[in-house]
UniProtKB/Swiss-Prot annotation:
This is Proline--tRNA ligase. It catalyses: tRNA(Pro) + L-proline + ATP = L-prolyl-tRNA(Pro) + AMP + diphosphate. L-proline binds at R390, H480. It is an enzyme of class 6 (ligase). ATP binds at residues 390-394, 401-405, 475-477, 512-514. NCBIfam families: proS_fam_I.
């Protein structure tokens, strides 16, 4: 059991973060529960030995797959021995076996020994079928893990069902009989869990003989290495445990590798670098000052540029009536599942439901007819910086997919199509600059397919980014040509020069705080955040290095001189003169937060009238004379931005595979690539391609680490390769119209 010197249960931080997020989601659904902390319990046997009250209510949970890679989460009573062959017959499948640890983590984002029905919330692709033993129906309360095995929840059975249903996973019920004739088949992964539990106990006993608090923290950091070793069939000795702990003593740093566990890496980076703080409403997050500073930087750039296009800032209300919101049917269909409604004030019901804006087209366009009467009133160009709410129940990801987010949304009205379309692409190019010049992120400009375009638009232009570590594209920004669709709905007309009534041609365009998440995913590394200089609050951190015989006052004065030189040149920097922390601690502290440049000053630097400059992006060091510090720093900031962009651009380019037949697609997708394919652009093929790639993803048998998820059209790139004569569509065989970029996406 993991205890500190006071006898308190110590739960690893990464597990605490998971359970805190879960608890917020449960409370949001008005679900009550009682948590009992008991220390590590990797198996049912361990949990039963904890002597919990009503232990017969502890559920046994099995994560299984069949030969065709259909996935099943089975929940039954803890005293039942399950025969997988018999269970295969019940589920009308064959060859059921336990899912390996990699896929357990990839699909349900959970570690062995931590499984519970609540983990179904992490099934982002909706590929897992949830089954409850029929006997669970008769249980008033169950005992399950809160996504980790250091505590258990006492929770009403109906509330567990309610929670699963809220994530679109209503359980099906099956009759699971006790296998009394023979032991059920047990996968080796259960043996691995037993070994992991033994090894954890061995470590904890050893830790308790030394320094409980510090040793246990180091033990948590080294957990991934321990698991890897056990999975290879080796149980660590006491000495080996101590050796491994000493290799990873920085408990404040990032403990997951970006390439190995991207989701956990991302969560650690945004929290430990002090960008995000979790909130008690799922999908809503606190943007801390470092994150909001990034938003202010891109906001200042965009404001300056749109004003050159004669766009004016304004603000429209947060609320919209149901009648107004539903006026444009095609438009609202895309948002209706996500709209949050206000139905009460105090204890009274509102006479009419009021929606919280998911976007502002219908809010703004209802007043446009009052402002636009003549061609002299055009063009009307407005922008607003605000928040919107989209109450979706997909797995939230800070910055990337949230229920409330900051954005800018622009809306314009023009007298003709030519003028409106020009603005659409002018704005799209500003989004390119937003990403390239400030976030050092390359994007692909293109046009959305008919099935992916904005509801109510004639066409949608898009900026697409790509995260090579997990093989997923992200829509970075969009700019829409709405034609006269909304003008006809809201009767936005003007009298032209010939006194003829015409409908206005409209545009709308937006970019969100998602851009910050894309930047983090693109540049971050195993040390933490990597900030492009143009959005880093502090460009430079100055760290003094003292020894016992050091003249601290002299070094302090020297560092202050460098600080003054940089600040006088408008380079914001911070002098870290904290006396209670070592230089190494300070290095890690600022590397985690992504500060572009570190300047080190020690006794030798003082003697040589120099300093050491270290780049965050590539860890290169150089010795620089004091008189050259300003010029070197200025050039280095430029070089860092350029290097970050070029490195990301190469990753993006290397992630595109050109294909001409569908047989080439899955190989590319499973290598975390996008595919550029000749396409007929038939809207019916979009859903066909999604379904087939989803099916093939689940049925892959050649690799246990195959990625899952459907492929969809991301965009038709504006920069088109030459199309050979008579080229056929890679899917339908019909004549191809253009090259289209396909891939998995967020």
């Amino acid at each position: 059991m993991n205890n500190n010197t006071n006898g308190e249960i110590i739960i690893p931080q990464e597990y605490l973060e998971k359970s805190e997020c879960l608890f917020k989601e449960l409370k949001e659904l008005n679900i009550n529960f009682k948590e009992v902390k008991h220390g590590l319990a990797a198996t049912i046997k361990d949990l039963l030995e904890m002597n919990l009250e009503n232990s017969t209510n502890i559920l046994k949970n099995l994560f299984l797959k069949d030969k065709k890679k259909n996935y099943f989460l089975i929940c039954t009573l803890n005293n039942k021995t399950v025969d997988l062959k018999n269970l295969s017959n019940i589920l009308k499948t064959n060859n059921l076996r336990f899912v390996d640890e990699n896929n357990l983590n990839n699909i349900l984002n959970i570690q062995p020994g931590c499984l519970s029905p609540l983990a179904i919330k992490n099934d982002k692709e909706n590929i897992v079928k949830l089954y409850f033993d029929e006997e669970i129906k008769n249980m008033q309360e169950v005992i399950i893990h809160p996504l980790h095995n250091y505590s258990s929840l006492y929770i009403k059975t109906q509330d567990v069902i309610k929670f699963c249903e809220s994530f679109n996973h209503a359980p099906e019920y099956v009759q699971i009989k006790e296998d009394t004739t023979s032991k059920a088949r047990v996968d080796k992964k259960e043996d691995v869990q037993e070994e992991m539990a033994k090894n954890e106990e061995l470590q904890n006993n050893n830790n308790n003989n030394k320094n409980n608090s510090n040793s246990n923290n180091n033990n948590n950091n080294n957990n991934n290495h321990i698991k890897d070793t056990i999975l290879k069939g080796k149980l660590l000795s006491n000495n080996e445990v101590e050796d491994n702990k000493s290799k990873d003593s920085n408990i404040l740093g990032i403990t997951s590798k970006k390439i190995e566990n991207f989701s956990d890496w991302y969560t650690q980076v945004i929290v430990k670098s002090e960008l995000i703080e979790y909130y008690d409403i799922s999908g809503c997050y606190i943007l801390r000052p470092a994150a909001y500073y990034i938003w202010e930087c891109v906001q200042a750039f965009f404001n300056k540029e749109i004003k050159k296009l004669n766009v004016e800032n304004s603000y429209f209300p947060l609320f919209v009536t149901k009648n107004k919101l539903e006026k444009e049917k095609n438009h609202i269909e895309g948002f209706s599942p996500e709209v949050a409604w206000v139905t009460k004030y105090g204890d009274s019901n509102l006479p009419e439901e009021i929606a919280i804006r998911p976007t502002s087209e219908t809010i703004m366009y209802s007043v446009f007819p009052k402002w636009i009467r003549s061609y002299r009133d055009l063009p009307l160009k407005l922008n607003q910086w605000n928040t919107v709410v989209r109450w979706e129940f997909k797995q939230p990801t800070p910055f990337i997919r949230t229920r409330e987010f900051l954005w800018q949304e622009g809306h314009t009205a023009h007298k003709n199509e030519e003028e409106a379309v020009k603005l659409v692409f002018d704005i799209l190019d500003l989004y390119r600059r937003w990403y390239e010049e400030y976030l050092a992120v390359p994007i692909i400009k293109g046009i959305k397919s008919e099935g992916e375009k904005f509801g109510g638009a004639n066409f949608t232009s898009t900026a697409e980014a790509f995260i090579s570590e997990n093989g997923r594209a992200i829509q970075a920004a969009t700019s829409h040509y709405l034609g006269t669709n909304f003008a006809k709905m809201f009767k936005i007309e003007f009298e032209d020069e010939n006194e003829v009534k015409q409908y206005v041609h409209q545009t709308s365009w937006g970019c969100t705080t998602r851009s910050i998440g894309i930047m983090i995913m693109t540049h971050g590394d195993d040390k933490g955040l990597v900030l492009p200089p143009n959005v880093s609050k502090y460009k430079v951190v100055i760290v003094p290095i003292f020894y016992k015989t050091t003249d601290e006052n002299a070094i302090h004065s020297y560092c202050k001189d460098i600080e003054k030189i940089l600040k006088n040149a408008q380079i914001n920097c911070v002098y870290d003169d904290r006396a209670s922390y070592s230089p190494g601690y300070k290095f890690n502290h600022w590397e985690l937060r992504g500060i572009p440049i570190r300047i080190e000053v020690g006794p030798k630097d003082l003697q040589n009238n120099s300093c050491v400059i270290v780049r965050r992006d590539n860890n290169e060091k150089c010795n620089v004379k004091k008189e050259s510090v300003l010029l070197e720093t200025q050039q280095m900031l430029v070089d860092i931005h350029k290097n970050l962009f070029l490195k990301a651009k190469k990753k993006l380019d290397d992630s595109i595979v050109q294909v001409t037949s569908f047989s080439e697609v899955m190989n590319a997708l499973n290598k975390k690539k996008m595919v550029l394919a000749p396409w007929c652009e038939d809207i019916a093929t979009e859903e066909e391609i999604k379904k087939e790639t989803q099916r093939l993803s689940l049925n892959q048998t050649n690799s246990e680490t195959t990625l899952s998820g459907a492929m969809k059209p991301l965009c038709i790139p504006l920069d088109q390769p030459p199309m050979p004569p008579n080229m056929k569509c890679f899917w339908s065989g019909k004549p191809a119209k253009r090259w289209c970029l396909f891939g998995r996406s967020y």
